[in-house]
Amino acid sequence: MDSKTLQTLRRDAEDICRSAIEASVPDAAIQRALAQLPPCQGRTVLVSIGKAGWQTAKAAYDALGSTIEQGVVVTKYGHSQGPIGDLAIYEAGHPVPDEHSVRATEAALAAVSGLSARDRVLFLVSGGGSALFERPLVPLAELEDITGQMLVCGADITQINTIRKRLSGVKGGRFAQLCAPAHVYAILLSDVIGDPPDMIASGPAYPDSTTTAQAMALVSRYGLTLSPQALDLLEQEPPKVLDNVTTVITGSVAQLCRDAAARAEALGYRTCLLTDRLQCEAREAGRFLSAMAGTHAGKGEKTAYILGGETVVHLTGHGLGGRNQELALAAAEGLAGLEAVVASVGSDGTDGPTDAAGGITDGATADALTALGISIDQTLADNDAYHALKACGGLVVTGPTGTNVNDITVLLV
């Protein structure tokens, strides 16, 4: 195992991930979508929500300027980059909604109230909107608790949103109803595999496609504890038809993977897209990739295996980390001694409740951790990948990126 080769592979893996994320920043795509809008005879109100909420609002404001009469931006703490004209900018809680989420949402609802059929709402949506944009129909403390239960049990984003859209006064198409009779032009940056519009930020402006039976089955499957009030709400169907909405999707994990492949090819790698629909336990994905490395490493041809999607973590410990860090750490043992690297990075720059976007490990990581007295198995059991990767230089830190289109994972051999 050559250390210089590993250094090159690590550098290239980070380069591929960072380049793909930079290419997915939505400015140009948002402006292209806005250019297709029909003329507005009345007022234009902007509402932009999500972890990319500031970036998408800035792109829209740069394109439309003073034609936007009023606007509200809701993004995650630390993701605002300053004023945008006279738009009202709020930061709020993610992945669990908080009182700032509710306050910001009420400001948005005030902005769209009383509009006429001549007016329009530009609704810019990115991942994270489910927590950031909220009018709870149960006490906020209970909604926070239910969200926490689903995050801990390993439910995927579609399952989580199936539950929480029924507990909200703005999700599942209800925001669009509150905008009526104004027309809503929804421009979506997708962070949900397969790009189902009703699941992106829990579909505030899209008809619901789920059923009460599905929601109740999730309660049973995961043993969720809900109040009688919440259970009653699960029995109520969100809107199934909306006649005042036009929806466009401008970015997705599929494009993120294509951009990663293009950068890998530019660096001289043969590329193989394994999937842009990765959905499984993070550590199982990491172990699978290390097994692939065992088969393909050292065969002569430089190859980049690319995956996109969103893994899950079933929390059993009380450590610190995120799904991308856990994936990378889980790969480390199987990579030992190989000229191979696994990098996994969240496109929004945030992986779990940490300051890292993801993690990177290689054929030397396992020995480095052993020398530090760190057990990979115990660390995974504790869900403490952050501290292990930090100790061996395996964290990938980008800061907020201005986009959010799932995660990018790369295996280089």
Label every PLM stretch briefly:
Residues M1-V47, Q55-T56:
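An N-terminal, well-structured beta->alpha segment
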Residues A59-I68, D86-I89, L109, S113, ...:
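A glycine- and small-aliphatic-rich helix-loop capping segment at beta-alpha/alpha-beta transitions
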Residues V74-A117, Q159, R164:
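Glycine-rich oxoanion-binding loops at beta->alpha junctions
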Residues E91, V96-H100, L151-C179, D351-T379, ...:
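Proline/glycine-rich low-complexity loops and linkers
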Residues P139-T225:
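Internal gly/pro-rich beta-alpha loop/helix module
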Residues A182-Y185, P207-F288, M292:
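Accessory alpha-helical/coil subdomains and C-terminal extensions
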Residues G268-S344, G352-P353:
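Active-site segments that bind and position negatively charged phosphate/pyrophosphate groups
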Residues L329-V413:
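Internal helix-turn-beta structural module
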